[in-house]
Amino acid sequence: MKFSKLSLTLALILTQAIFVLCGKINEDFMENGLESHALHDEIRKPIDTEKADAERGVVDCVLNTLGCSSDKDCCGMTPSCTLGICAPSVGGLVGGLLGRAL
């Protein structure tokens, strides 16, 4: 294949531009380390204690409740208590089969 002088020149310029860009990114990383990245920002964010307490409450509820006697015993995770088991309400053919099985 024959390439024109213009296409070779453009390819060379583009390659050099990519190397310069990668060099700038690498230089920034070498100077600042992880501090310049989004991962570092996420690690440094404070923990939302209200959300953690709510999650802990749900986990405690699930671990303390082996069976259910009413919908309230399902910890709000599934809508219905069926035959002592917290089961989601599923419609259609699958729901009918699950309903008969439970």
Swiss-Prot record:
Record function comment: Potent inhibitor of insect, but not mammalian, voltage-gated calcium channels (Cav).
A UniProt-annotated Pfam family: Toxin_23
Propeptide feature: residues: 24-56, 100-102
Keywords assigned: Amidation, Calcium channel impairing toxin, Disulfide bond, Ion channel impairing toxin, Knottin, Neurotoxin, Secreted, Signal, Toxin, Voltage-gated calcium channel impairing toxin
Notes concerning its domains: The presence of a 'disulfide through disulfide knot' structurally defines this protein as a knottin.
Tissue expression remark: Expressed by the venom gland.
Cleaved signal peptide residues: 1-23
Protein family according to the UniProt entry: Belongs to the neurotoxin 15 family. 02 (omega-actx) subfamily.
Protein name: Omega-hexatoxin-Hi2b
Classification lineage: Eukaryota, Metazoa, Ecdysozoa, Arthropoda, Chelicerata
